[in-house]
Swiss-Prot record:
GO MF assignments: ATP binding; DNA binding; zinc ion binding
Protein name listed in UniProt: Putative transcriptional repressor NrdR
Pfam families recorded: ATP-cone, Zn_ribbon_NrdR
Zinc-finger ranges (unnamed): 3-34
HAMAP family recorded: NrdR (MF_00440)
Membership in a protein family: Belongs to the NrdR family.
InterPro entries referenced in this protein's UniProt entry, alphabetically: ATP-cone_dom, NrdR-like_N, RNR_NrdR-like
Annotated TM spans: none
Keywords assigned by UniProt, alphabetized: ATP-binding, DNA-binding, Metal-binding, Nucleotide-binding, Repressor, Transcription, Transcription regulation, Zinc, Zinc-finger
Keyword Glycoprotein belongs to the record: no
PANTHER family for this protein: TRANSCRIPTIONAL REPRESSOR NRDR
Length: 149
């Protein structure tokens, strides 16, 4: 690591500690040339897979798009923001765990429905009605019947 004071290349780590519930490392470093001390933080870079849309267009994963879709389904429902964040983190973890560089949007939609089903059945039906393009009341009834099984 370059020294921010004299830009020398040689620095040594004096102390390392986990911070942020173990999600990052704080390091105290000392320059071997000018002896100045400074702090660095290291965080793992978690790369999300690209999304393959139904029309075969590929685009970067967009967490805001995922969040807004879930929040739209959960609008005016008694679900806490913490529960929504936990569900989003679970979906992202599952996507990373595939190890794939690209995932179909259908997989993401199914993961969202899985999480919504656990959070709130009404939100699940709202999302499923759009995601699966329900065309009449019969489609709603069939999905509700599946929920009750």
């Amino acid at each position: 690591m370059h020294c921010p004071f004299c830009f020398a290349v040689d620095t040594k780590v004096i102390d390392s500690r986990l911070v942020g519930e173990g999600s990052s490392v704080r390091r105290r470093r000392q320059c071997l040339v000018c002896n100045e001390r400074f702090t660095t933080f290291e965080v793992a870079e978690l790369v999300m897979p690209r999304v393959i849309k139904s029309n075969d267009v590929r685009e970067p994963f967009n967490e805001d798009k995922l969040r807004s879709g879930m929040l739209r389904a959960l609008e005016k429902r008694p679900v806490s923001a913490d529960d929504v964040e936990m569900a989003l983190n679970h979906i992202k973890s599952q996507l990373r765990a595939t190890g794939e560089r690209e995932v179909p949007s259908k997989m993401i939609g199914n993961l969202v429905m899985e999480q919504l089903k656990k959070l709130d059945k009404v939100a699940y039906i709202r999302f499923a009605s759009v995601y699966r393009s329900f065309e009449d009341i019969k489609d709603f009834g069939e999905e509700i019947a599946r929920l009750q099984d």
